[in-house]
Amino acid sequence: MEEIFALIVSMILIVAVIPLFFWKRRRDARSREEVAEPPQVQPRENVARAGGGRRMRRRPAASGASSSTSNVQENGSGSEDEDEDEAGGTQARASKKKEKKRQEREAQRQAEEATRESRNTKQDWYAEMRRKKDEEREAEELKLEEEEKARQAKEEEAAALEFDKWKGEFSVDAEGTTEEVQGGNQDLLSEFVEYIKKQKCVPLEDLAAEFHLRTQECINRIASLESIGRLSGVMDDRGKYIYISMEEMNAVADYIKRQGRVSISHLASKSNQFIDLEPKVQHQLTEEISGMEEISVS
C-alpha cells in the first residue's frame, strides 16, 4: 500500500514538472534570441556627426541587454526555486501523511496486542480459578471420604466390641442349637430378643428406652445378634427394626421362585401376605379374650 501511494505521488510530481520544464525552455530560448540579436547599424552620414552619441547609446543598449539577461536568469532561477519549493512541499506532505499512517498502524497494533494480552490474562485467571475450585472440591471429597471411612471404622470397632461383650455373656456350640448361660445376663439377652420378636416392628428409640440403652447401642446389639443368627430382619429409614422370621423369609423366597422376575413394588405390595407385622402380644391378648368369652358363654 505504501509503495502504491509513493508511485502515485511520483507520477503527480512528474506531470506537474514537465509543463514547467517546457515553459522554462521557451523562456530561455527567447532570452537567448534577444541577447543574440545584433545592434542596428546607423547610416554612414550620421557616423561622423553622431559618433559620440552612438557610443553613448551603445553603452545603455549594452547595459539594457545585460540587465535583460540578468532578469531572464533571475526569472528562470525564481521559477526553478518555486518548482523546487512546490516539489519539496509535496514530498513533505506525502512524508507527513506516510508517517501519520505509520503511527496509526503502530497505535492499532499496540491496541490489538494490549487487547490480546488482556484476554490471555483473563483466560489464565479463569483457568487458575477453575483449577483451584477443582482442587478444593477434590480435597473436600477426599476429606468427606476419609471422615466416612473413619466413621465406619469407628462403628465397626464399636460393633466388634459390643459383639465381644455379648459373646462373652453366652456361647454357642458347633450346631448353634444349645446355649450355655451364666447368671442373669442370659435372661437379659433373652428378654431383648423376645421383646423384638413379639413387637415385630419396634422403633429403636422405644427399644433403647425399654432396656435403658442408647439408640446406637441397640443398633450395635441387633447387628451382633444378626451376625450370630439370633435375629433376622431389616431397619427402615424411619428408625424402626422389623423382625422377619426364617419361615417368613422362606415364604418370600418361594414366592419369588414361583413368580420368576418380580419388581420391588410388586413384592412390597405382596409382602403383607407373607410377613406378619402385628405384635404377638396383641394376638395373645385377643386369643385370651376370645377364650374367656367362650368360657363365659358356655
Swiss-Prot record:
UniProt feature coiled coil, ranges: none
Transmembrane segments: 3-23
Region Disordered, annotated ranges: 31-155
Membrane topology: Single-pass membrane protein
Main location: endoplasmic reticulum
Cytoplasmic side: 24-298
Topological region Lumenal: 1-2
Gene3D superfamilies: Winged helix-like DNA-binding domain superfamily/Winged helix DNA-binding domain (1.10.10.10)
Cellular compartment(s): Endoplasmic reticulum membrane
Protein name (database record): DDRGK domain-containing protein 1
Species this chain originates from: Arabidopsis thaliana
